[in-house]
Amino acid sequence: MGTFLVPELIRLGYAVDVISKDDVHSDNPDLRYYQADFCNDGIRNEFLDKNYDVIINFMHYHTDVFRNIHPSLLSHTGQYFFLSSYRVYADEKVPVTEEAPRLLDVSKDAGLLASDDYAIAKCRCEDILHASGKKNWTILRPAIIYSHANLYTFKLVSLNGDLVMPRTRMGKPVVLPREAMNIHAAMTWGGDVGKMVSRLVDNPAAMGEIFTISSAEVNTWGGIAECYKNAVGLQYALASKDEFLDILSNNPEDRECQRWGLDYDRLFDRVIDNAKVLKATGLKQSDFMPIRDGLKLELEAAANTPAPFNKAASARMDSFLSKQG
């Protein structure tokens, strides 16, 4: 997300410090990079002592960790951005608005609720902010974001770029669950995410508020598969949900986590009403990149980038396809 957000912030006149594990250099006096690990308590406290006007935090926290560190995060900045996810939403309201019920509040899946799964942890961290007694936070609930800067973000249903990209380059089909093909999906170009988030910075309308960060464009997973096909020649075959999960993982615990992600997100109709973020930022839906154009742009930009490769899942995919004749 930072790949597109940082230039937007610089363009809007902000001075930006970026903390990254990568060694990055800048010739812009308003942009400084620090190679550091923000998870380290000592390093984090060093940066918090700078008392930034705004902190935009893209890290994922388990609930217990965030409960311990959120007081210092909130007390050392004027506005703290917490990265949640649109995955917190249950499947009870279409289109989805910020007031839609959350999984944590309505799910009957005891195993999910007993876990600190990604979506559940996000819900609980949101609740921690609400209970903090402060209002200098802004919660971001982004939909699926794609960008050439991270090839893992080229997603298709539950597949990540470590299967979509290498198999497409090898001319091999990917396997998708047929149950998902007519389900609506929410994917947004990273550049549009940068536009939305940058305009919430130092914005009084964003204080103590939650925003779904997404285009309102409506597509099905089948339609998005066709966008990949048109952009880079992706081929795909269909399987049942159970067959698809068997391909993703042969570890029972991990398979259950994959099932949660499929059943409680990718198989939910994700039609987004983004009126709230449009109102707060002054943007219009027409300002956003259509997914067919955005995917083509980012896939072309990533054409010469080595792709991560999930060899084990790819081998299971090959095995499944060989049995189909």
Place the predicted regions along the sequence by residue.
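Conserved Rossmann-fold NAD(P)-dependent oxidoreductase catalytic core, especially the SDR/UDP-sugar
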Residues: H70-R124, H130-S132, T138
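Glycine-rich Rossmann NAD(P)(H)-binding loop
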Residues: L176-I183, F211-V218, K229, Y264-D265, ...
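N-terminal Rossmann-fold NAD(P) dinucleotide-binding loop
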Residues: G2-T3
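NAD(P)H-binding glycine-rich loop region in Rossmannoid oxidoreductase-like domains
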Residues: H25-N28, R32-T77, F82, V88-D91
